[in-house]
Design a protein with these regions (language model features):
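Feature captures outer-membrane beta-barrel proteins of Gram-negative bacteria and organelles
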Residues: 97-99, 154-156, 185
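Functionally engaged cysteine thiol sites
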Residues: 1-10, 127, 131, 151, ...
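C-terminal beta-signal and adjacent terminal beta-strands/loops
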Residues: 66, 111-130, 157-185
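Gram-negative outer-membrane beta-barrel transporters
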Residues: 1-122
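Extracellular loop and loop/strand-boundary signature of outer-membrane beta-barrel proteins
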Residues: 24-29, 78-86, 129-133, 138-143, ...
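Residue-level marker for the onset of beta-strands and adjacent loop->beta junctions
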Residues: 95-96, 152, 164
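Short, glycine/acidic-rich beta->alpha junctions
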Residues: 90-91, 147-149
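Outer membrane beta-barrel transmembrane domains
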Residues: 125, 133-144, 151-153, 157, ...
């Protein structure tokens, strides 16, 4: 069990005491994640924009992931930096921008979502000829790029009376298809 005391303490098969042998069936949490990066947020609100009643709010949120190390905690399984791997949830950059006009009788919200270009995975060895032997830790692949995406959403609310409002939301208003991603299942 690779000298790991958490594993070694989970069983005894050569006990000198009669009936002292045991196997403790339990989950072991040896995996770890280490991440670094930063978030940015800014917002501003105008009252009576352009002399109109109500308010106009803009807000932007950004995230940059510099490093996202995943370690299975098992010898023979390589530690992988998944930052920039767009098949998961860790693109290098992602942004969310929101603009809202809010009035007593209604509101309208525009939202933009964007994430940066990336790769399918950082574990791949990219090559076309003279490739090394493909392994579980470092499989070979001839193309490892995934385009980023931009999505535009719109939503709103209408106040019917003091007790009722109606809401609507359309995600991906322009029906932008996601970038194809290779799957194993």
């Amino acid at each position: 069990f690779e000298g790991n005391q958490a594993f070694c303490g989970g069983f005894e098969l050569n006990s000198p005491v009669q009936g002292g042998n045991f196997i403790n069936v339990q989950p072991f949490n040896l995996a770890s994640w280490k991440t670094s990066g930063f978030d940015i947020e800014a917002s501003y609100q105008w009252q009576r924009p352009l002399g109109l009643p109500g308010s106009f709010t803009v807000r932007a949120l950004g995230t940059h992931v510099r490093e996202f190390l995943v370690d299975a905690g098992i010898a023979g399984v390589d530690r992988i930096d998944q930052a920039g791997a767009n098949t998961g949830n860790t693109p290098d950059w992602k942004w969310l921008a929101i603009q809202t006009y809010d009035h007593d009788a209604f509101s309208i919200t525009l939202q933009q979502r964007w994430f940066s270009d990336g790769v399918f995975g950082n574990q791949y060895v990219v090559c076309t000829t003279g490739c090394p032997a493909s392994t579980g830790n470092h499989p070979t692949i001839d193309f490892n790029r995934m385009k980023g995406a931009f999505y535009f959403d719109v939503g709103g609310a209408i106040k019917v009376n003091d007790q009722a409002s109606m809401f609507f939301k359309v995600d991906n208003l322009f029906d932008q298809d996601p970038e194809p991603s290779p799957q194993t299942n």
